[in-house]
A protein has these predicted regions:
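Terminal amphipathic helices with adjacent charged low-complexity linkers/tails
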Residues: 1-21
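N-terminal leader/propeptide and maturation segments of large enzyme subunits in energy/redox metabolism
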Residues: 18-91
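Thiamine diphosphate
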Residues: 27-31, 38-41, 85, 91-177
């Protein structure tokens, strides 16, 4: 984890298995559960705060899927929460890192995306959740010395496929649409 001058920055996590989709999706679902908890706490306590704070709560709820706006609201809301001496303000303050809508990325190679991890990838795509997926497509299994894979184009010569791959490459981009 590395941070900028504001103490913010990208984080990286990976699993030892070819389950990038499931792992990344689980991280996304976990973050969204915490953000839903923030929203619920705001909604339950809207009538216990002054109008300015209630307006911030409403603004955050209305814009919770927008990174730039949630950052702006967070910058105003966190110092305000620090000044309140209530359990609900402390609960939201404790979850302040989740006030900003993050950008969730799931990354992996073509062996994962086209083959061994395709079931998980298909599940993530079908969920229609707001995650980004990056597939590094070398068109062969790079970790095995270049064997042909489902991402290898028709006719390509690769290790253990010296006469060329006989079937068409899986069209992952079309499947994702």
């Amino acid at each position: 984890y590395t941070t900028d001058a504001n103490g913010e920055g990208p984080s990286w996590a990976s699993s030892l298995f070819e389950d990038n989709a499931e792992y990344g999706f689980g991280m996304h679902i976990g973050v969204e559960a915490l953000r839903s908890r923030i929203q619920h706490t705001m909604e339950e306590n809207m009538d216990k705060v002054d109008e300015d704070i209630a307006t911030l709560f409403k603004d955050w709820i209305a814009n919770r899927q927008f990174s730039v706006r949630t950052r702006e609201i967070r910058d105003i809301l966190v110092p305000t929460l620090e000044a309140l001496n209530t359990d609900f303000a402390k609960e939201i303050w404790d979850l302040k890192q989740y006030l900003i809508k993050n950008s969730q990325w799931i990354m992996g190679g073509d062996g994962w995306a086209y083959d061994i991890g395709y079931g998980g990838l298909d599940h993530v795509l079908a969920s229609n959740e707001d995650v980004n997926i990056l597939v590094v497509d070398t068109e062969v299994y790079s970790n095995t010395g270049g064997q042909a894979s489902k991402s290898t184009p028709t006719g390509a010569v690769a290790k253990f496929a010296a006469s060329g791959k006989p079937v068409k490459k899986k069209d992952l981009a079309a499947i994702a649409m």
